[in-house]
Structure formats: C-alpha cells, structure tokens
Amino acid sequence: MRLRRLFAIFALLAVAASAAAAQAAADPTVALLVDLIRVNTSNPPGNERLVAELLAPRFKALGFDVKIIQSPDTAKAVIVARLKGDGSKRPVLLSAHADVVGVERDKWTVDPFAGVVRDDQVYGRGAIDFKGGMAVFARAAMMLAERKVPLARDVIFVAEADEEGGGGYSTAWLAREHWADIDAEFALNEGGWIMKGDDGRVRYVSISTADKSSVPLTVTAHGTSTHSSMPRPDNAIFALSRALAKLSAYETPIELTPAQTQFITALARTSAPPMSGYFRDLIGPDPVRARHADSVVSRDPLMHSLIRNTIAPVIIQGGFRNNVIPGSASANVNLRLIPGSDLGAFMATLGRVVGDSTIELKTSAPIYTQTAPSSENTDLYRALVNAAHAQFPGAEVTPYLFQAGTDAGAWRSRGVPVYGIYPYPIDADELTRMHGNDEKVSTASLKQGTEMIYRMLVEVAGRR
C-alpha cells in the first residue's frame, strides 16, 4: 500500500514538473530560445544559415521585409528582417550573433543542444551568449508587428555570423559588402549586464558604450630538441612555463575610463558596507586605499577584468612524442585592452616582466579595433535607460565598458552608436556558466528582458 502511495506521489510530482516546463515553454520568448538552442551553431563551423532559415518564415508571417544574405561559405548566412516605419526617422537596429562556442560535452548534465527547460531555467549552449539575447530582441521586434505599433522609423533585426571566431564572415564582412542593409541611426548589441544580488533583486543595469580590444599574443620558447633521456637546461617547455608563471604573477595596474568610473560610483551607491566603501576608495584620490580596495574588489573576476588590461593563456602547444624533447613550445595568450591603451608600451612591459630575451612575444592585429565610446546623448540610449528604470524600479542604470569584445565595431567604426546589453537579469553563478558548462537563463528573466526591450523600441521607434 505504501509503495502504491509513493508511486502515486512520484507520478504526481512528475506530472507537475512536466506541466510547469510546458507552461514555461509556452512563453513565446522561451519557446523561441529553445528552438534556437536546438540548432547547433558551434563555431567552427557555425552553420548560421540554419538560424536564418528558422527565423525567416516567422518574420515574414508578421509583415517584415526579410533578406537572407549568403556568404561565400554556403553554411554561413545572415538574416536581415526589417519592419517598416514611415521613414520620418532613421532606422534602429538590433543585432545578435547566431554562432556559439563549442562545449565540453562530458561536463554538462544535460544535452547542450536540446533546449532543456527545467526548474524554470532554459539550459543550453547560447542560453546567455547570445541566443537568449537573440530570442529577446527578435520577440520584442515581433511584438511591434503583432500589436500594430505605428512606427516613425524602420526596426531592423540582424542575426549575424562569425562573432565567436572560426571564419571570415563576421559583421566586418557584412558591413563591407552589404552596408546599405544594416545602416542605422544607432544599434543595440550584446554587452552590459542586468545583475541580481543575493536576494534575487536587480541591483544594476549596465549599458556598454565601448568594448575592450582583444589582442592575440603568442609566447614562444626555443630549446634543443633531443632524446628525452638526456634533458638539457634549455628545455623549451620549462622555459615557456617560467615565462607564463611570471605573466601570471604580474598584476596589471588599474586603468579607469569615464564609463568605468560611473559604473563603480553606481556600485558604491547600491552596495552595503563594507563593499560600498571599497568601491568609493577604488576611484578615490588615495592610492594606498585604492590598492587595498582593489585587492578586495578584484576577488570578483568580472570586476578584476573591468578595471585593468588582462592576460589570459588559452592554448598551450609543445611536443609530439613521449621520448622527444621538443625544440619549441608556445602558448596562445588572449590580451584584453582597455580603450586608449598603448599596445606597444604594454608589450614592452610584458617583455620586462618575462625578463628572458630568448622568449619570443608576438602579437597579431587586434581582433576588435578601438573606437570612441558611443555617446550617451542619443534617443536609443535614453529609451533603454527609461525602459530599464520602468522594468526594474530601484536599480541603478549606468554606462559601462564591456570587459570582453563584441562585433559592434562594424557600426562604431562608421560613426553609428552601438549600445550593449545582455537583456535578462542573471546572477554570479549564471554569469560563470557563460562559455562554460550547463549554461542557463531563467524563464522569468527572458520575459522581463523581452518586456524591457519592447518598451525601449516603442519609445525610440514609435510614432507619436
């Protein structure tokens, strides 16, 4: 009898869980994100054309002018969906990349490409970066058509390729070959954060107006290649290890732009003591207090990367047989530089840090060229600020320097202001999962983000 009751309870719980998941998936933004995650666009190879083909009929059904731009790589394509306004104002553009980074499948507890909805969370590669943002942007634009909002300007949605690397058909190619299709007065992309505190409430909304530059650095050590039974002092792998250890121990100095200072000021207002005091000291005039504040604030990886240039080894190469000492070993290192940084001076500093003339430090051109920060004095920025305040009362809304890079440079380099946001509230745990394992975003956050971006679009594009 007890077993029957237990089975009955388990059955009821299973039905309830299934019903809750179905209810969450019924939300249009959640449902769209699930569909997007199920299209595996890991880059390489990308296969972004599949996303364009998924979205095209949905936009067409709502009256959007839809164009699929095919790149020379048949697997890579861009969708441009335009909802026409009366033309009295120039277009506003929403841009989201369709590709995602790959996964370490054995470290996930769910299929990363199944779009699992569990416990009011959508799991899958791209849930945060950036198919979640794509779903929010797309649904907000679609809602304008569904609700027949009169528009003073065109609203353009773009799902582009190769943001995560792996090919040559990023927004730089798109702008060079098809600028007329994506020209706008201003644009919204990925970037800033809507961060929740421990109590689950949104503390701040940061809107990025600039990105760090990404600079690939190769560190190479040379030595004598010989039999592994006869090790020599000039072992290339040991030399590379010593060089990387020195780079790891080097703490780059604090560098603050106006956007960073505004952001940290906002954190000082929203944080409880003693963190509020540390944030004030970080941007204060006393260098001793600033250094101490840095030692505390920088325990948060996001804050550490925000206020300085960073050095991150990502790939190590060396050796090819167990019984051969290789003649060289190298490491790929990712440098992230704050706008205005002097790359030559920074490289000279790294050379002094390594302190070994036999170690070769070689950079290639920055992936994301530096451009001036986008102005905060635009209708789009003001509309996003207003929408954020309306959606998250009491939260600080502040400009922000994005600690990573985006593909916004294609527009910024042509004088088009671009603002960045991951348009859903997340917490520190969810942020860590981005590009990591069991990436997820909550269904409630997706709904809130869609409402916020819709509000923004009505204000900036609606006809008054």
Pin down the residues of each PLM region.
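Extracytoplasmic/secreted envelope proteins and their assembly/folding machinery
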Residues: 30-36, 49-52, 56, 134, ...
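Bacterial N-terminal signal peptides
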Residues: 7-18
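Metal-dependent amide/peptide-bond hydrolase catalytic core
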Residues: 23-24, 192-449, 454, 458-464
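A glycine-rich helix N-cap at a beta->alpha junction
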Residues: 176-192
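N-terminal helical capping/dimerization or prosegment-like subdomains
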Residues: 23-105, 328, 332, 343-344
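N-terminal secretory signal peptides that target proteins for export/translocation
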Residues: 1-3
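Active-site metal-coordination/substrate-binding segment of hydrolases
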Residues: 89-156
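Acidic, glycine-rich active-site loops and adjacent beta-strand->loop/helix elements
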Residues: 74, 98-100, 159-167, 190-195, ...
